[in-house]
Every structure is written in structure tokens, then in C-alpha cells.
């Protein structure tokens, strides 16, 4: 809390007045990050609604959020147990917002059209894979987003 107060330019007493404990502060940070990443994804899809690139747009918005907000990702490294629990807790709400954005594009995927997966299951799988990059970072978020969007689950295997 001392470091946070110093970084914010406020006294520890003021910080404790608003947040009480480190856990309350972390929860407030997590809630803000959850809201902002959801908004970033929704805004990215609104700016580029083409279904042909929808998966890449969603994944890239997630990755770029991390790049644009490195302090949010620092919390993941400083408090990994809290971060894992927070992501686990937030994932259902994130999925509820983002799945409807992905489903129209995923309905065109060969794995969905063949009946191997539902569009909702494929959306959840993609979002879970993308979420792991918050713990195993990449120096090339754009390339990673393109790699995930190019999965055979979405486009079929080279032999199909």
C-alpha cells in the first residue's frame, strides 16, 4: 500500500480511508480492468464489424489492452494468486459480453458447421486461450492475434 500511495501521490492514510485493505484495493483495480477490457473489445468490434476479421479484432483488442495498460498487467505479476482468482471470477461475465460478438463469425467456422463444436463452445475456447497470454506474455500481440484467428478450428485444416 505504501508503494501505491507514493505512486498516486497521496498519503497512506488517504489510501486506507478509501480502500481499507490491500484486498479491497486489488478488487477495485480488477473491477476497473474488467470493465475497461470489455469496453475495449466492444468498441473494437463496433469500429470494425466485418465478420471475416471478427475473431482477430476481438483477440487483438484483448492483447492491445494489455499493451496499452502495462500497470494493469503488473498486478498480475505482483499478486499472481489474486490475479488468477480474479480472472476466474470475471471470466463468465466477460464471456457473456464477448460471446455474442464472436458467435456470428464463428457460425461460419468449419468446426461449427460440421457439428464438432457449438459457436459458444468455440468462443469460450478462443477467449480462454487468449486470456492465457496475460500470464505468458508475447512481444508480438498482433502476430499472436493473427495466429489464434488462423486456427484450423476456425478455417479447417490444410488438407480439408
Could you describe each region identified by the protein language model?
Residues 64-68, 104, 108, 124-143, ...:
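Amphipathic C-terminal alpha-helical segment
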Residues 21-24, 50, 71:
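Residue-level recognition of oxygen-bearing side chains
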Residues 7, 24-46, 57-61, 96-100:
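Alpha-helical structural segments
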Residues 35-38, 83-113, 117-124:
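Amphipathic alpha-helical packing segments from all-alpha helical-bundle domains
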Residues 66-91:
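Amphipathic alpha-helical segments used for helix-helix packing
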Residues 52-67, 120, 124, 145-149:
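Amphipathic alpha-helical segments that line or abut small-molecule/effector binding pockets
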Residues 1-24, 28:
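Helix-turn-helix
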Amino acid at each position: 500500500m505504501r508503494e501505491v500511495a507514493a505512486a498516486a501521490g497521496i498519503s497512506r492514510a488517504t489510501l486506507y480511508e478509501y480502500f481499507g485493505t490491500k484486498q479491497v484495493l486489488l478488487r477495485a483495480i480488477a473491477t476497473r480492468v474488467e470493465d475497461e477490457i470489455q469496453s475495449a473489445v466492444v468498441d473494437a468490434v463496433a469500429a470494425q464489424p466485418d465478420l471475416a476479421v471478427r475473431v482477430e479484432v476481438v483477440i487483438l483488442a484483448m492483447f492491445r489492452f494489455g499493451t496499452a495498460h502495462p500497470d494493469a498487467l503488473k498486478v498480475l505479476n505482483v499478486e499472481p494468486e489474486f490475479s488468477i482468482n480474479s480472472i476466474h471470477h470475471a471470466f463468465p461475465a466477460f464471456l457473456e459480453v464477448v460471446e455474442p460478438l464472436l458467435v456470428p463469425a464463428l457460425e461460419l467456422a468449419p468446426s461449427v458447421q460440421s457439428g464438432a463444436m457449438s459457436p459458444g463452445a468455440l468462443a469460450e475456447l478462443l477467449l480462454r486461450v487468449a486470456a492465457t497470454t496475460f500470464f505468458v506474455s508475447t512481444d508480438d500481440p498482433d502476430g499472436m492475434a493473427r495466429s489464434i484467428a488462423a486456427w484450423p478450428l476456425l478455417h479447417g485444416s490444410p488438407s480439408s
